[in-house]
Design a protein with these regions (language model features):
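Hydrophobic/aromatic side-chain positions at a characteristic register within alpha-helices
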Residues: 19, 26-27
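C-terminal motif of bacterial Sec signal peptides marking the signal peptidase cleavage site
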Residues: 4-7
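TPR/TPR-like alpha-solenoid signature
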Residues: 19-20, 57
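Generic helix N-cap/helix-start motif at coil->alpha-helix transitions
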Residues: 13-18
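Alpha-helical linker/edge segments of TPR/alpha-solenoid repeat scaffolds
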Residues: 58-89, 97-100
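Internal interaction segment
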Residues: 173-181, 199-267
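Short, charge-rich amphipathic alpha-helical segments embedded
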Residues: 35-67
Length: 267
């Protein structure tokens, strides 16, 4: 019995020593080491209940500090992204009808509808969440019933898959066809344009019951290049917002647990 008591007391002392070192690591800002030391108390000294209880409280403080520091970092990153966005957004036209649109779309100025009536081309757009898409617009006479496009330079090319969102209409007897492609499911068309942006002869071919070929104008190529840059900034900001939300949720959870522990201690 005396041996068991001695061993028990020894474990308590060792656990207390680990807890002391964990506190020191926490104060030094070495949160990973502090967590390892707290976990060691639970693993190696499961019956050192007082040390384990204090370890749980310390772990909550570690979690809280980590999330608060993470928020500070995320806030600084968001400020950097916002500054970049502020410098970029003047290059684009934001179209948004607040009556029925929650999210607006950014266009390159040369590609807005009113400047392109009667023109067949590939239009790029990026919504306010950083999601980029392409729209192939055909109105060169007659119907193609096109659902895909190909961009090419010489023997190299990229081709969209068949669009899941294509539609046709007429305007004063002229056939107008449009097909949408989300970037990421565009068959590498955007990346092909980026890789060949310095070429002057990027061919654009509309693929349907028959084909129609034209050459991408320099401003259409530039629209894709510029909007890719905007998409990266906006999507990066959306990712930061998600991480900020997660950090705030974790902070509220930890604070609630700490409050519960305080109330339990009073009882």
């Amino acid at each position: 019995m005396a041996g068991l008591l001695t061993a028990c007391n020894g474990d308590k002392q060792k656990a207390a020593g680990l807890l002391e070192r964990a506190n020191a690591s926490f104060e030094a800002g070495d949160y990973n080491l502090a967590k390892l030391q707290i976990d060691s108390i639970r693993t190696f000294y499961p019956k050192a209940f007082d040390a384990r209880k204090e370890g749980i409280r310390l772990m909550q403080r570690v979690d809280l500090e980590e999330q608060q520091k993470s928020l500070v970092y995320l806030d600084s990153m968001m400020a950097v992204k916002q500054a970049v966005l502020d410098s970029l957004k003047t290059r684009f036209v934001l179209e948004k009808d607040t009556a029925y649109q929650e999210t607006g779309n950014n266009f390159y100025p040369t590609q807005v509808v009113e400047k392109n009536i009667g023109r067949s081309f590939l239009r790029a757009q990026v919504n306010e969440l950083g999601e980029m898409s392409l729209t192939s617009i055909y109105c060169a006479g007659g119907n193609l019933h096109h659902t895909a496009v190909r961009v090419s330079v010489g023997d190299t090319y990229a081709e969209t898959p068949v669009s899941n969102d294509s539609y046709e209409t007429t305007d004063l007897g002229r056939a107008i066809e449009k097909a949408d492609y989300k970037v990421g499911n565009d068959g590498g068309v955007v990346n092909f344009i980026l890789a060949n942006q310095d070429k002057k002869n990027i061919q654009l071919t509309f693929l349907g019951d028959r084909t129609y070929r034209t050459v991408m104008q320099p401003n259409d190529v530039k629209a894709v290049v510029e909007l890719v840059e905007l998409a990266k900034v906006l999507s990066g900001m959306e990712e930061i917002k998600k991480e900020q939300k997660e950090a705030n949720l974790k902070i509220r959870f930890v604070e609630r647990k700490m409050q519960e522990n305080q109330e339990t201690s009073k009882d």
